[in-house]
């Protein structure tokens, strides 16, 4: 038997592309960029951030991998990405060998001293924006991204709080 050569990339081969598309969407959102960049209560009332300035958040407040910076003494807000559970796509008891599905995780958290903003709780505002940007949208994998999980996230002895939220991405194997 010979293995059939496939054309195109699998979902796992495209993970890097998916993550960069996700981060570009996040950094393109003035709401997320302001909540990440400005630690003040009036973060959303600040002037819009220039595109090149939003990309300066990469690897300082935004990370394309699951990374928790050593932030115990530093106040700030952070957004990181992770992946989990990539597998053959299954619906009910039927498994589809031609497709893969998995979760893209957003981890975002903020120091307890800067959670409050003039417009609400910082991580709640971020959650609403991430949901708006990704839930039910297309452009990553085939079909729509679908909300999979949402869990509260507390780290560094409860000095930082936020959420872990995941969306299912499905693509060809």
Positions of PLM-derived features:
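Short, solvent-exposed secondary-structure capping/transition elements
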Residues: 89-93, 114-120, 139-144
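Extracellular/virion structural assembly segments
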Residues: 97-99, 109-133
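Active-site-adjacent structural patch at catalytic or cofactor/ligand-binding sites
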Residues: 82-113
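Small/polar-rich, solvent-exposed N-terminal microdomains that initiate assembly or binding
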Residues: 2-92
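Acidic-leaning, charged glycine-interspersed low-complexity segments
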Residues: 121-173
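A general secondary-structure signal for short beta-strands and their flanking turns/coil
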Residues: 74-76, 97-103, 158-164
């Amino acid at each position: 038997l010979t293995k059939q050569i496939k054309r195109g990339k699998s979902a796992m081969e495209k993970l890097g592309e998916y993550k960069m598309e996700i981060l570009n969407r996040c950094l393109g959102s003035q709401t997320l960029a302001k909540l990440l960049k400005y630690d003040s209560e009036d973060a959303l009332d600040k002037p819009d951030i220039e595109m090149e300035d939003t990309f300066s958040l990469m690897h300082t407040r935004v990370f394309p991998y699951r990374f928790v910076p050593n932030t115990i003494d530093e106040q700030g807000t952070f957004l990181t990405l992770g992946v989990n559970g990539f597998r053959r796509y299954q619906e009910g008891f039927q498994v589809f060998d031609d497709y893969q599905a998995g979760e893209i995780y957003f981890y975002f958290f903020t120091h307890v001293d800067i959670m409050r903003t003039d417009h609400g709780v910082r991580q709640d505002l971020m959650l609403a924006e991430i949901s708006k940007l990704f839930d039910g949208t297309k452009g990553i994998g085939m079909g729509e991204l679908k909300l999979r999980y949402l869990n509260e996230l507390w780290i560094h002895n409860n000095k930082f709080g936020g959420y872990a939220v995941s969306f299912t991405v499905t693509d060809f194997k």
